[in-house]
Amino acid sequence: MDHRSKELFERAQQLIPGGVNSPVRACLGVDSDPLFVAHAKGSHLTTVDGTSFVDYVQSWGPMLLGHAHPVVASAIHAAVDRGTSYGAPCEDEVVLAEAVIDALPGVEMVRMVNSGTEATMSALRLARGVTGRNKVVKFVGCYHGHADAFLASAGSGVATLSIPGTPGVPEATVRDTLLAPYNDLTAVAELFTLHGKDIAAIIVEPVAGNMGLVLPMNGFLQGLRDLCTEHGALLIFDEVITGFRVNYGGAQKRFDITPDLTTLGKIIGGGLPVGAYGGRADLMRRIAPCGEVYQAGTLSGNPLAMAAGIATLAELKKSDYDALEARVAALATELQAILAAKGVPVRVNTIASMFTVFFTDQPVTDFASAKTANAALYTSYYKQMRDKGIYLAPSPFEAAMVSFAHTDADLAALLDAARAITLSA
């Protein structure tokens, strides 16, 4: 069935480390080989073998409008004809910046970069430069890209592959990364008691999406805001996943918490290689060339990504987020009932247009509880669902993503597939 994908994977393994350009794509966490994609449209992707799947990965989140949305595609095609890279400012940079600032309450100025990792590492550099402090608080199981400061006890592919420690990261960098369990305000307060004068920032996924989907408990985000204000540290919201997905104004608008700095990912470029970081104007003016904190990039503000971003945000701004959330909430409720009826422990966490299936009988509120989920059950679930045309994240520590392009028939296909599979505890 997947002969062409297998052939390409064998070739790739001789040329590319692990045969993939990002580790989780190797599907090692679900004991499978990766599928090679030929093309994608709307809620579906088609492999090089011609097999079509309902896609619940959506390029790991940014394709909220679905793949190859006609308005976004047209904007990209038009931009190509104007030139693919200038290395100089263009009007679309200004227009996209205006749209981002208009949407996000905590962003008064914004700097475009090329990835979520660039955004988070640049935001942390700015926080350190502004405060004159070195330490950062991050949460166990949260993933903020592959910059050195963020790899300690990280989620996403680091968790999926069970990579121990942080090989290649200097010990001094590791020592400057302070860890706390997600949703544990007491632990964060204790870190400030011990290291408060040295902490530059807290960085947090306001909704964790890289240990599976874990929601913030009541008061958690406000508590982080209060601790940062009290101790003169900056609060960084990593909204690479949540930005423009949980709300057009991001998690900061949904939860009414204003961070000092915000990081964004590929959704602001319609899935193209782009990211951004922004925040209070007084902080952002500390970045070169108007300030002393240096950050640069030849492809930052790339005209293709800017054009795609303008089109994407314009479409998202007029989309019905509440209706999509209601559909996904109903899907998650029904999916949990279907799987529970098979006699396996299961919890389905959901918010907005995301959900994660955890095969555990306890609430999942942090990475420790996420790891109680039965990985072997998830592997069986993944393989059987894939065999039935449902493309899920090849890791128990990622969220499923639903787009505005997913039809009721697409959601029904997932539920029908879940009914048809066999699981045993």
Curated annotation (Swiss-Prot):
- Specify the pathway: Porphyrin-containing compound metabolism; protoporphyrin-IX biosynthesis; 5-aminolevulinate from L-glutamyl-tRNA(Glu): step 2/2
N6-(pyridoxal phosphate)lysine: modified positions: K266
Report the top EC class in one word.
isomerase
GO function terms (MF aspect): glutamate-1-semialdehyde 2,1-aminomutase activity; pyridoxal phosphate binding; transaminase activity
Which chemical reaction does it catalyze?
(S)-4-amino-5-oxopentanoate = 5-aminolevulinate
Q: Which Pfam families match?
A: Aminotran_3
State if Plastid is listed as a keyword.
no
Keywords from the UniProt entry: Cytoplasm, Isomerase, Porphyrin biosynthesis, Pyridoxal phosphate
Domain of life of the source: Bacteria
Is Cytoplasm there in the keyword field? Answer: yes
Chief localization: cytoplasm
Q: Name one GO cellular component term.
A: cytoplasm
This entry's Enzyme Commission designation comes to 5.4.3.8
Q: Which cofactors does this protein require?
A: pyridoxal 5'-phosphate
Family stated for the protein in its record: Belongs to the class-III pyridoxal-phosphate-dependent aminotransferase family. HemL subfamily.
Q: What assembly does the database describe for this protein?
A: Homodimer.
PANTHER family, per database record: GLUTAMATE-1-SEMIALDEHYDE 2,1-AMINOMUTASE, GLUTAMATE-1-SEMIALDEHYDE 2,1-AMINOMUTASE 1, CHLOROPLASTIC-RELATED
Instruction: Check the record and name the NCBIfam families matching this protein.
Output: hemL (TIGR00713), PRK00062.1 (NF000818)
Name-wise, this protein is Glutamate-1-semialdehyde 2,1-aminomutase
Species of provenance? Nitratidesulfovibrio vulgaris (strain DSM 19637 / Miyazaki F) (Desulfovibrio vulgaris)
